[in-house]
Amino acid sequence: AQMSTQTGIDGVLIGAYSALNGVFGSRFEGPNHWVTGSVTGGEANKGTDPGDYSTINPIQRYENDPAAGDLNNLWRGRYEGVSRANKVLALLAGDASSGIQASIKTVMEGEAKMLRAHFYFDLVKHFKNIPVFDETVSAADVSTTKNTSDAAAWTLIESDLNFAYSNLPETQSQLGRVNKWAAASLLAKAYLYQQKYSEANTLFDAIIANGKTPAGAKYALLDNFAGIFNAENDNHAEAVFDVESSMNTGSTQNANYFDDLNYPYNTGQDGPGICCGFFQPSFQMA
């Protein structure tokens, strides 16, 4: 019965948002992807002690076993996010949403599609020929869905983001919910990854000229670069897509997931992350 109310379906949507920061407790599910991005890209090294989190080492050397746990957890976590977004969309398309105002349903659909596109974008960046399924695919067919290219993924990503860009509001009453300009920015990035430079340029021009944060602030550069990382500046004018977290819950260290290892080594009990000196700049970058 709860699933047939706006509050119930919104709770499922919030569950999809929660997958942004990981589901299965693996640090590789964190949204930063500094290992698969900066470390494999050459501008950073793992850092810390040689034996600490040694499963990162083969990833840096491009020797990772496809069956290794870290990347498998990234795969599982992102598909869990897809599944949660699909559940929202299935509920909105069914009888359960009949009592919800049409305009509210459209916004909820836009948020769910933006999230689904984000999860698929992460998957297509990390893996090849990923299976793609939307809210119409039955659970029985999910395990047999296959693909021989990334074309289907990009098609769905573009479709979802175009819908979100066209239907999401510029501002949101609850910070943390995505707005139309977050969708536009991710869509422009998707165009870049596909070498659709003309489409990306047109969209970036619109974002620069008109883009706003969900709080309504026009996109702008902060006066101090360090201010981007100051918690007191959450949802600042450079924040296009923020992943919100609770605080003072005692559930983890004082940092974004996986970034909590990257503070200076042995900063002590009162330090920002207690340890560990990961994610150090490489000589190549310097």
Language-model features: locations:
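An aromatic- and glycine-enriched ligand-binding surface/loop that stacks and positions planar moieties
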Residues: 1-52, 130, 162-165, 177-182, ...
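Conserved, well-structured interaction surfaces
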Residues: 6, 10-14, 18-24, 48-127, ...
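Short coil/linker segments at helix-helix boundaries
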Residues: 105, 129-150
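Alpha-solenoid helical repeat scaffolds
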Residues: 122, 126-129, 135, 193
